[in-house]
Swiss-Prot record:
InterPro entries in the record: Mopterin_synth/thiamin_S_b (IPR016155), RnfH (IPR005346), RnfH_sf (IPR037021)
Gene: yfjF
Annotated protein name in UniProt: UPF0125 protein YfjF
PANTHER family found in the cross-reference section: UPF0125 PROTEIN RATB (PTHR37483:SF1)
Gene3D superfamilies: RnfH-like (3.10.20.280)
NCBIfam families according to UniProt: PRK01777.1 (NF002490)
Length: 96
């Protein structure tokens, strides 16, 4: 009988956080964990072709395998370029 592992799948929005615990077969992938969590059905804004994923803030691929106790994180796309935002803030403070 294959070993089972327990993994958490997390997706955070400004107003709500989702954290689903799933039990998977040993050798399961990041994508399998996300699909088993049901988050793709709950949140239609998640697109695995566009959203980046990670395990404990470390970027990973959908095909990477998960380990027991991992927290798989689905990241939202950036809505603004961080460099452009810093530049705008610097220009604003210089103009004061």
């Amino acid at each position: 009988m294959p070993d089972k592992l327990v993994v958490e799948v997390a997706y955070a929005l400004p107003e709500k956080q989702y954290l689903q615990r799933v039990t998977l077969e040993e050798g399961a992938t990041v994508e399998e964990a996300i699909r088993a969590s049901g988050l793709l059905e709950l949140r239609t804004d998640i697109d695995l072709a566009k959203n980046k994923v990670g395990i404990y803030s470390r970027p990973v691929k959908l095909t990477d395998t998960v380990q027991d106790g991992d927290r798989v994180e689905i990241y939202r796309p950036l809505i603004a370029d961080p460099k452009a935002l810093r530049r705008q803030r610097a220009e604003k403070s210089a103009g004061r």
